[in-house]
Amino acid sequence: MKKRDKMKMMGILILLLAVITVAITLILVSRLSKTAGKDQKEETFDRSVSGMLSNAYILKSEEKDIIVLYRGETYFAEGKPEKKYTGVADIELTKGKVTKIYAKPSTIKGVLTSYSSKSVQIEGYEPLSAEKDLPVYLVASSGHAKIPVRQGKISDLVVGNSKVELVVAEQKACALVSYQEDMAEKVRVLLKNGKENTYASLFVCSGDAYTVDGNKRKKDTVTDAEKLLKGEKTGKEIKISPDTGGLLYRCDKNGNPYGSGYEGDLILRKEKKGYVLVNEIPMEDYIRYVLPSEMPLSFSYEALKAQAVCARTFTYGQMKNDTYARYGANLDDSIAYQAYHATTSYEVTDQAVADTTGMVMTYKGKLADCYYYSTSPGYSENLEVWNAASPGYLLAENHTREKTKDLSLLPATPQSIQVWRQAAG
């Protein structure tokens, strides 16, 4: 047989093996009995079924009463478990019965700081490679919940906020379990380097004392990302925290600041193409800086309050956005999200934020989609601008008192041309 024919035959065998594996898995799932209601008859597995269900969630395991959550569905099964167990496990089936439950009690507890399609990271730990289609189990905080555990997606969790248990086996992430519905208290803002997400070099300083991963540093000391992260693996994070009331600055190697300082913590993260800089800041403080970046101080106080509510609603709506999850951030500081300039805060905007603390807009019990623009001729648009279907509250309307004039029909005058040239610079 020629070498080319051997290669072809080997490829066919590998493909055939993959098809058989998928077929067995589908048969296992199809033979399970879904629970559809209180009065539904409990069925068992087909007696001919044998195999393994990986990373399922055991809801109940008592003699002849085993309930399993697997791939988003709840199933009944028969068997005699060695002991009661609730949690993530591999389940062995033999002739339709549960013959073995391989518990996975090894977990890492902490805050979810980043994730991608291939890895998951918990605060204080290096990223771990993850199972494909990593299962995420959301456990209700109330013991009286109608659905005590449901299967969700990793995007249901909030980077920098969600407290989770990462189930680990053989140094690999097998599943994520979250025991609470997270209301984000902090925002992680990616501080972009122009259009880039990374910096080739990165220095941080402060006019006050500060700490680097808990180690005290004197004021005016420059922290060099390269020195701290040299030799570390991709994904390694270092948290820099100012003393109470202090600010942190991105600076050059001599300690000369670039622009204004940041409240909250700065997180330096090593990536393949350089370093990422993230500002972790309490939600309300973030809104304090967004508000004057998005609306002039000269606007009416009620308008400032309304903008604060819009900004807060928009931010909460973006917390589960996975665009920057791999960098451990929720959003960035550009106008692609909201303008976030760490400039001096102002009393009037600070008060507008304080007077609306925690307030958001909802529609039918869910956060409203808040879209707003910097400049308007008095006519609003709906979501067609973003090639999306518009909800009932986003309408294209004329917001002027009088009918909008068609300015395209007005003749240009020397005066209007001069005004335009001055405005254009």
Name each model-derived stretch.
Residues 2-425:
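Conserved, single-site charged/polar hotspot
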